[in-house]
A protein has these predicted regions:
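Glycan-binding loop/region signatures in secreted carbohydrate-active enzymes
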Residues: 1, 88-144
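N-terminal structural segment of carbohydrate-active enzymes
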Residues: 1-76, 81-83, 88-92, 134
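The substrate-binding groove and active-site-proximal loops of carbohydrate-active enzymes
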Residues: 1-11, 43-57, 127-143, 159-169, ...
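Alpha-helical packing segments of well-folded alpha/beta enzyme cores
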Residues: 9, 13-16, 59, 63, ...
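Short acidic catalytic loops
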Residues: 25-33, 47, 73-80, 142-170
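Short capping/connector residues at structural and topological boundaries
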Residues: 39, 47, 52, 85, ...
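Active-site-proximal helices and loops of the catalytic beta/alpha 8
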Residues: 64-70, 82, 87-98, 150, ...
Length: 247
């Protein structure tokens, strides 16, 4: 259930850093940590606020600093293809005021694609709690990857990179802009992408996606490799078929 919570916070991670260092861990990838009304937090309510259940921005800054001292870098999860419906940007429940559902004059209104306003709108895979955003909208781009935007804010707070949620649903131009911002902060910062198929041969409406062209992702979540390894370990694939699946 998206409403079941099992504890754990940023300070808890900090308390385990010595243990993680002993294990040889060099990077921690955190699932979404920003304010949201679910436990998975892929329905972002506020990109600039740590979910209070996890801690504060000060906790995050300290975690990143302590991790870096131990040779561990922190990677954040960037959910930028959609927001939460209960967010300061969409505000379907009227929680925040001045969201896209509150008025067409809201600064966030151009971010979304409405049909019959405000009841009908495009959403991620039909989930009404996840309204899609228009990534090529100038004001949205400025908010995410512009000067002083979301990416820069959390990189300056200590993050060492981002993992893009559903990268295969983000325009190539948006990914390139995200990369430019991340690398402008430090060439060592990392940009990963969630791509469910072979990222080197992923096809989109305009043909092959440019993930591996050198100006988008540094790497991707290798789900085909994961599946091949799991199936081999479970006895569902022999060594030959596993090798074929990996290639």
């Amino acid at each position: 259930s998206p409403n079941d919570y099992f504890g754990g916070d940023l300070r808890g991670i900090e308390e385990k850093l010595d243990y993680l260092q002993e294990m040889g861990i060099s990077c921690l990838y955190l699932n979404p940590i920003f304010e949201a009304d679910s436990n998975h937090r892929y329905n972002t309510a506020d990109y600039r606020r740590i979910d209070p259940m996890l801690g504060t921005e000060e906790d995050f800054i300290r975690l990143c600093a302590q991790a870096r001292q131990r040779g561990i870098r922190i990677l954040l999860d960037g959910v930028f293809s959609h927001t939460g419906s209960d967010s300061r940007y969409f505000d379907k429940k009227g929680t925040y005021g001045n969201g896209a559902c509150d008025s067409p004059s809201s600064p966030y209104y151009p971010w979304y694609r409405f049909g019959r306003y405000p009841e009908e709108y495009e959403s991620w895979w039909g989930f009404a709690t996840l309204p899609n955003v228009e990534e090529t909208e100038q004001s949205y781009g400025a908010f995410i990857h512009g000067e002083g935007g979301v990416l820069q804010h959390w990189l300056e707070a200590g993050a060492s990179g981002w993992r893009l949620d559903v990268a295969d649903e983000l325009p190539d131009c948006f990914i390139r802009d995200v990369r430019r911002r991340i690398k402008a902060q430090s060439p060592d910062n990392v940009l990963l992408g969630e791509v469910w198929e072979d990222c080197s041969d992923k096809q989109g409406p305009q043909g092959r996606r440019g993930y591996v062209n050198g100006d988008e992702l540094d790497s991707a979540m290798d789900y085909p490799l994961r599946r091949a390894i799991l199936d081999f370990c479970a006895g569902k694939l022999d060594a030959f078929d596993a090798a074929e699946a990996m290639w």
